[in-house]
Amino acid sequence: MRFWWRLKKKVLKRWARDAFFPSWRITMLRWCGYQIGQDVYIADELIIAEELEDRGNLTLGDRVSIAPRVTLVLSSHPNDSRIRPVAPVARAPIIIEADAWLGTGVVVLPGVRIGRGAIVGSNSVVTKDVAPLNVVAGQPARTIRVLPTPPGWT
């Protein structure tokens, strides 16, 4: 049974990466077991790096916007390297809260939570949690600005 789940997930992720319509992309990713909110936009070439048997390790809140070529690393890849005993596989969920934006080429590492309304600048590497309404950029990403609270937010 695990084999069929892994095969299905690998095929769906591949199709979703280059789906013609963003709505198709989101539907296929939901079929993979990812939690995706309403009015989410995911551009072309999203890479989700994980072990294929992992389920439910990615949560995208409502109105999240993900630009092209973003990489979400849910787990580092297991291998047979001799350094594996001292550098084990890192595996942790990624949570991107409502109204967050990820710019082109962003890389998000395992265990990161990106807060509500946060903006991650293009080509940034996010290694730690991002507070709500923070604008971060760089490698590693650092806060460069804090946005004011929008009207109507509670």
Residue ranges and their predicted role:
Residues 16-17, 52, 88:
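Residues that cap or flank secondary-structure elements
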Residues 32, 38, 43-44, 49-50, ...:
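Left-handed beta-helix
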Residues 81-87:
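Flexible, solvent-exposed loop segments that connect beta-strands
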Residues 22, 50-51:
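Short glycine/threonine/proline-enriched tight-turn/helix- or strand-capping micro-motif at secondary-structure
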Residues 13-14, 49, 85, 103:
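A generic structural signal for short
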Residues 89-91, 143:
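Short proline/glycine- and basic residue-enriched helix-capping loop/turn segments at helix->loop/beta transitions
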Residues 80-81, 110:
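Short glycine/proline-enriched, acidic/aromatic patches that form the donor-sugar handling elements
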Residues 1-34, 39, 63, 76-79, ...:
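Terminal amphipathic alpha-helical/low-complexity segments used for targeting or macromolecular assembly
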